[in-house]
Design a protein with these regions (language model features):
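Extracellular glycan-recognition regions
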Residues: 1-117
Length: 117
């Protein structure tokens, strides 16, 4: 997945929900925490006892936008946000939906491409 996310002034976080199931009991989430200057990948699994995992990296956001490249291979996820890399694993997450979210603001998703192999 390749996209450009842009957000309004004052937005706290934007991101992508990945591999979500219909009831949102399991998911992976790429969060761009605009206010805190970091990207993080978090995973949640309510099925196996409220398990929560987190990986993060610092990033400097410019002009209220970021280019995001997400590569998924099995349970391995590699993401680039404005050339800052974050790699992690999403165990026990199956095939699901992809979505976009925003916290306390507005987000726009442009130049989006989904590539499958």
């Amino acid at each position: 997945l390749q996209t450009t996310l842009s957000w309004s002034e004052g937005t706290e976080a934007v991101g992508l929900m990945i591999h979500t199931d219909d009831e949102l009991r399991k998911w992976c989430q790429l969060r761009l925490e605009v206010r805190h200057g970091k990207i993080l990948m978090d995973r949640y699994n309510r099925v196996d006892g409220d398990q929560y995992y987190l990986d993060e990296r610092p990033v400097v956001f410019r002009d209220n936008k970021a280019e995001v490249k997400l590569i998924v291979s099995g349970n391995i996820m590699l993401v680039y946000v404005d050339d800052v890399a974050l790699a992690c694993r999403c165990y026990e997450i199956g095939i699901g939906e992809v979505g976009i979210f925003v916290e306390y603001g507005n987000v726009r998703c442009t130049q989006t491409r989904l590539l499958e192999q």
